[in-house]
Curated annotation (Swiss-Prot):
Highest taxon of the lineage: Eukaryota
Gene Ontology terms, MF aspect: electron transporter, transferring electrons within cytochrome b6/f complex of photosystem II activity; metal ion binding; oxidoreductase activity
Short name of any one Pfam family annotated for the protein: Cytochrome_B
CDD domains for the chain: Cytochrome_b_N (cd00284)
Record: residues binding heme c: C35
Gene name, Swiss-Prot/TrEMBL: petB
Coiled-coil features, chain-numbered ranges: none
Annotated family: Belongs to the cytochrome b family. PetB subfamily.
Species of the source: Lactuca sativa (Garden lettuce)
Name by which UniProt lists this protein: Cytochrome b6
Example GO BP: photosynthesis
Length: 215
C-alpha cells in the first residue's frame, strides 16, 4: 500500500492537499449556525443519491407516472424508505438554505470582498426552489398537477410575452406530457448540473476568502 501511496503522492502531492485542508484556520466566533451551508450540501447529496435510485423505477409519462410512484412506495425493495428520505431531505434542504441565507445576511457575509460568493449563493437558492417546483409535479397526482398549472400560468400576466412564456414552460397550451417531460429533464439533469457548477464556484471562494466576521 505504501508504494501505491508513494506513486500517487509523487504525482499529485496528496499530503500537501491534505495539510492545506486540515490546517485551515477556523475563527473562534464560528458556531453551529455557520454549519447551515454544509448541512444544505449534505441534503443535496442525499437528494442526488435517492433521486438516482428512484429513476430505476419512475416512468415520466402522464399515464404511468403516478402508478410508478405507487410501485416505488409499495412494491420496490426499500422504495418507501428511499422516497421518504428524498421527500424529507428536500424539505430539510429548503429550510437549511433559508436559514443559511439569513445567517449570511445578518453577519454581513455579502459585503466586500464576498459579493460574488453571495451572488452564487443566491443563484443556488433559486435553483433549490426550482428543484421543489419541478419535483412536485413528477408524481402526477392532483396536488402536483394543479401546483404546476398555477406556477406555469403566472407568467401569463406579463404583457406581450406572457402567453409564449407559458407555452415555453408547459411545452404546449395546457399541462400535459410535454410539461412532465420538461420538468423531469429539468429536475434530473439540468438543475443538478447547474447546481454542481455553481457549488464548484461557491465553495472555492469561501475557501479563499474565509469565513465572515461575527455579528
Amino acid at each position: 500500500m505504501s508504494k501505491v501511496y508513494d506513486w500517487f503522492e509523487e504525482r499529485l502531492e496528496i499530503q500537501a492537499i491534505a495539510d492545506d485542508i486540515t490546517s485551515k484556520y477556523v475563527p473562534p466566533h464560528v458556531n453551529i449556525f455557520y454549519c447551515l451551508g454544509g448541512i444544505t450540501l449534505t441534503c443535496f447529496l442525499v437528494q442526488v443519491a435517492t433521486g438516482f435510485a428512484m429513476t430505476f423505477y419512475y416512468r415520466p409519462t402522464v399515464t404511468d407516472a403516478f402508478a410508478s410512484v405507487q410501485y416505488i412506495m409499495t412494491e420496490a425493495n426499500f422504495g418507501w424508505l428511499i422516497r421518504s428520505v428524498h421527500r424529507w431531505s428536500a424539505s430539510m434542504m429548503v429550510l437549511m438554505m433559508i436559514l443559511h441565507v439569513f445567517r449570511v445576511y445578518l453577519t454581513g457575509g455579502f459585503k466586500k470582498p464576498r459579493e460574488l460568493t453571495w451572488v452564487t449563493g443566491v443563484v443556488l437558492g433559486v435553483l433549490t426552489a426550482s428543484f421543489g417546483v419541478t419535483g412536485y409535479s413528477l408524481p402526477r397526482d392532483q396536488i402536483g398537477y394543479w401546483a404546476v398549472k398555477i406556477v406555469t400560468g403566472v407568467p401569463e400576466a406579463i404583457p406581450v410575452i406572457g402567453s409564449p412564456l407559458v407555452e415555453l414552460l408547459r411545452g404546449s397550451a395546457s399541462v400535459g406530457q410535454s410539461t412532465l417531460t420538461r420538468f423531469y429533464s429539468l429536475h434530473t439533469f439540468v438543475l443538478p448540473l447547474l447546481t454542481a457548477v455553481f457549488m464548484l464556484m461557491h465553495f472555492p471562494m469561501i475557501r479563499k476568502q474565509g469565513i465572515s466576521g461575527p455579528l
